[in-house]
Amino acid sequence: MAEEVRQELSALAAIFCGPNEWEMLSCSETDGAVFRIHTTAEGLVGEDVPLELAFHLPVGYPLCLPGISVTSEHLTRAQCVTAKEKLLGEARKLVSEPMVHELVLWIQQNLRLVLSQPETVSSHEKCTLPESATGDDGPWMTLLRLDHMRARTKYVKAVEKWASELRLTGRLMFMGKLILILLQGDRSNIKEYLILQKTSKVDVDSSGKKCKEKMISVLSETKVQTEHKRFLAFEVKEYSTLEELQKEFGAAGLGELFSECVLGLVK
């Protein structure tokens, strides 16, 4: 992790030092840093709207965009998505320099304006920069592995909900103890999905207490290629044999991905 990023994290922890304002969720040399900032901003009628801003600073940050998630019990999902899109637009203007504090200040000062816009504004209507300028043009695909899923019914419902809200397609795949999630869609939405999965209490620990997902691995992340099948929906599927799972990947033009990332997990 770059020294300037370490300094930024230290500064953020000092700035947001009030009760429950700052929460570091994970930090590593390989996956970057994931943290939450709890703050407030002025709403449509001057009321204080509590905001939960989750950020993922990947290893390449600040030369690449951070992952951003906006949640609030006082806002609709569409309003949260619009706020996230606006923040990503501001982030594109600040690439190559530490930006998190600037982004928090921006949403604090501009939430009222964001909320005054129609809720129909969403991630398929981005206009801040041409897509080709972001380097993320076209759909992306990410393959994830979960170590376990104790509260399976609740967990599956959460995954389906996030995929639907973020317009992601793909598969949640079970084969014995192997659990894989294959996602296709807008890269910023996949990043937000990862933040939600890492910061939400979707499972339970061995004592039955609600807990966050700490054992998720990103096996692959790449642009969807012409030979790859585009999934039309997000589905939950179970496979009784390795051959069935391999056929699923092969039918989607992902035989190489299966050989490189999945086969070794079950041998």
UniProtKB/Swiss-Prot annotation:
Record bears the keyword Nucleus: yes
Protein keywords: Cytoplasm, Nucleus
Domain called RWD: residue spans: 7-114
Domain of life: Eukaryota
Database matches in SUPFAM superfamilies: UBC-like
Any one cellular-component term (Gene Ontology): nucleus
Entry annotated with the keyword Cytoplasm: yes
InterPro entries linked to this entry: RWD_dom, RWDD3, UBQ-conjugating_enzyme/RWD
Region of interest (Interaction with UBE2I/UBC9), residue spans: 13-15, 100-102
Subcellular locations according to the entry: Nucleus; Cytoplasm
Any one biological process term the GO annotation gives: positive regulation of hypoxia-inducible factor-1alpha signaling pathway
Its biological purpose: Enhancer of SUMO conjugation. Via its interaction with UBE2I/UBC9, increases SUMO conjugation to proteins by promoting the binding of E1 and E2 enzymes, thioester linkage between SUMO and UBE2I/UBC9 and transfer of SUMO to specific target proteins which include HIF1A, PIAS, NFKBIA, NR3C1 and TOP1. Positively regulates the NF-kappa-B signaling pathway by enhancing the sumoylation of NF-kappa-B inhibitor alpha (NFKBIA), promoting its stabilization which consequently leads to an increased inhibition of NF-kappa-B transcriptional activity.
Assembly mode: Interacts with UBE2I/UBC9, NFKBIA, HIF1A and NCOA2.
Domain notes: The RWD domain is required for the sumoylation enhancement activity.
Protein name per Swiss-Prot or TrEMBL: RWD domain-containing protein 3
The species this protein was found in: Mus musculus
